[in-house]
């Protein structure tokens, strides 16, 4: 018999009754019923019940051991009595009569329990992540991640893509978030950067003559944590294709996502084909560029209705309305509760009216609306008895942010929200540039390597804020899974694009020397995308936080509490790297959000 096991803990069934077995695993739980010990033994594959009767070697040994001790046991498979069968356990029809026990790894006092999902704070869980990963939910999430990545690889190869690796040590670049830098011992005073994304390398592969590239790529960004973004390191399905237009990129990715979410979605519906929603339409209808289409409500811009209104709360402001069917009969508590939710998201309040059976409007602001206002709103919003309407007024960005949150919450509270589905969409026609309202500076709104839709003519003739890029996002259930773009592969066009964003020719020629050199030696039209693997798994696992799907994530302050990283270097190491430290100074705007190349 094998030194440690003849079977795994999850594979024994009623057909194995009478078999002598050897198992190894962790002591998951123990119950003492009149001196008879019932032990749940756990390994990677499942759980099985052990029985150790009084006076047996197994009973004496197991009685002294703590939970999570690793043991090897010998015993015989026996059938459980009919009253003791556990139908929720694959091994629930059998148990193991223990004859021998060997301790392989004793466990001391545990910092938290493993066999329950109790309220242990995240910092504690990350400090003892190896224990946290023993929990059933976490173990299942990591195994789901493994299966998803394996499936992605298989499907990408079937779609005609080739997996290729790109460098981890590369050069820093001016676009995107902050780099993680690595000092070069052999080149004093110089630094490598860990790649924020393999952006330039995957484009260079297309210029090298390869046609369809993919990689499960590690990416590194020195940015703040969010629920859907882990600081430090993350993984993306990096994709690039030659001789393609936008729809050519959409087709294989849409097929991949549909098949992947169907395979691992546990019966949840996957909507296909994915609708294409222009960026500006998304901002107006949903309040953001990552709409949760499970919420079956849309915002309506009614700013013109109140442009010259006597109602000061709305007059001259950007005003967005949210009509909600079948809600007028809700209690005042419903309306007040949604108002409180809006305040929590930055609003000063939430104006509303409801439509009565006779078509008249009632509510806190009804008395401020003229007959013309009522008629226009009724027509514009297609109001009928039973409707309620919620209003947000103020600056465009502020109203968009608040009302996007209210839209989803109102849908959930009023019964207009779909459960058990994955609602995908493409967001297209992104603006190429944006203006910093404080400095007045024009900068790239997203990916600086995107092709402007009108080419060089647009860059030379149009207002930069009116230029659209061949850039797109794929969104699912309000989570942005990826950005992508058709690339700007023409040198002069690229230089002009950067010039508009304030980069002089010399800087661009220096920072992107490799790219420009390649573009000048025969570059094909190409484009790509990079869906986030961590976010895909987060959605499939139905987890609210991305760190629940990563084996060893950093905490919100980009610290590894288990390994103690980041660490200080001793003076000898610093001298070897030609580095001298100075007292840290808080950087102005250190926590400001950063643009990113692709996600």
Curated annotation (Swiss-Prot):
EC number: 6.1.1.12
UniProt entry tagged with the keyword Transmembrane helix: no
GO MF, one annotated term: ATP binding
SUPFAM superfamilies referenced in this protein's UniProt entry, alphabetically: Class II aaRS and biotin synthetases, GAD domain-like, Nucleic acid-binding proteins
UniProt-annotated binding residues for L-aspartate: 175, 221, 446, 487
Binding residues for ATP: 221-223, 480, 532-535
Disulphide bonds in the chain: none
Region (Aspartate), start-end ranges: 199-202
Subunit-level organization: Homodimer.
Family note: Belongs to the class-II aminoacyl-tRNA synthetase family. Type 1 subfamily.
Protein's recorded name: Aspartate--tRNA ligase
Annotated source species: Streptomyces griseus subsp. griseus (strain JCM 4626 / CBS 651.72 / NBRC 13350 / KCC S-0626 / ISP 5235)
